[in-house]
């Protein structure tokens, strides 16, 4: 059975970047856009799992994003 790893993209309103929270050993991501986050995550997760967790046959990765912003009244 394949192990499922979890990656969450969290918006840091102070720094204005997306940052990662994850159970993938060694994974640290910080990007300006969610599209950049996803693209980088797809590359780095594979590398981090191979280098730090000995995963070479593949794994499942569940990822989510979460952010909060202030909405000004119209």
PLM features per residue range, with description:
Residues 1-10, 35, 39-74:
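Short, charged, surface-exposed hinge/linker loops at domain edges
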Residues 3, 23-25:
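Short strand-coil-strand connectors
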Residues 10-23:
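Short aromatic-glycine-(Arg/Gly/Cys) micro-motifs in beta-strand/loop hairpins
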Residues 25-36:
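A short, exposed loop/beta-hairpin motif centered on an aromatic-Gly-Thr core
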């Amino acid at each position: 059975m394949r192990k499922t790893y979890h990656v969450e993209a969290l918006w840091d309103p102070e720094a204005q970047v997306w940052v990662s929270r994850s159970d993938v050993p060694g994974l640290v991501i910080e990007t300006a856009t969610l599209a950049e986050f996803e693209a980088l995550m797809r590359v780095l997760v594979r590398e981090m799992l191979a280098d730090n967790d000995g995963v070479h046959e593949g794994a499942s990765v569940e990822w989510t994003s979460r952010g909060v912003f202030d909405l000004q009244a119209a």
